[in-house]
Amino acid sequence: MKKIFLIVFIFFLQKTTSQKIYKDYPLSKIIEETSGLEIINNLLITHNDSGGEASLYYMSKEGEILKTRKIESASNKDWEDLTKDEKYIYIGDFGNNFNNRKDLKIFKVPIDINSTEKNEIISFNYPEQDSFKINRNTIYDAEGLISIDDKLLIFTKNRAKKITELYLVPKYPGSYDAKKIGTLEVNSIITGADYNKDLELLALTSTINFNEYYLITINNFSLNKKKNYKINMFEIPIEKTQVEAIKIITHKSFWITSEDESTSDYARLMKINL
């Protein structure tokens, strides 16, 4: 069994605004609350935030919806992110804006749309949470999910301390205590996550006050290396919006999506270059 080290993070902020939005496409009203991003068979995949249909939307790299996939035996209480491995898509239904959810889960769905394999549920809780009273400053909300090795890694959204805590859960169906393995001092609130195994690159999106948005990168990220990490933080040159998802293309190029906000008439798909 592989040993998973407690990850220790050193906050070394390298902040710049030199990146550019290289491409910018409007998204359909059907996905106006886009809140996750993946790539499968050269198609981008997204889903809506809370209250939408329990569906995945497959779209071109110009943002056109080409296919809608309804997720059977699932509901969308507050889907926040998705990730994948070689065989499955994992959808994080763990939005917890008011601190009171006791039904946090991740849906495990075959990548193959024609598969007869049934969808499965990975339920979890934060073992440190001892109160479920409504609290807008909850530290048990999350918007980031990645697949890494044989685990799923959840990034919490701590509004009070502007940090993210990292929790591991298995990829197998069942009910689990999520295992806290580290804290990342990002001085902001995490809104999306992605990991590229080949590049060993972790990428996050974040905000401070929903007026400024950032892209965060950490190189050589691994669960099996006990080390300190350098955190690179780049301001995204975008007006007030709500950046919700990220997908790595290369070390210097990323797809991001933003929700439909009052300052725009539509959600957006953007390609950003550092």
Where are the regions a protein language model picked out?
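Bacterial Sec-dependent N-terminal signal peptides
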Residues: 1-22
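Sequence/structural signature of beta-propeller domains
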Residues: 19-274
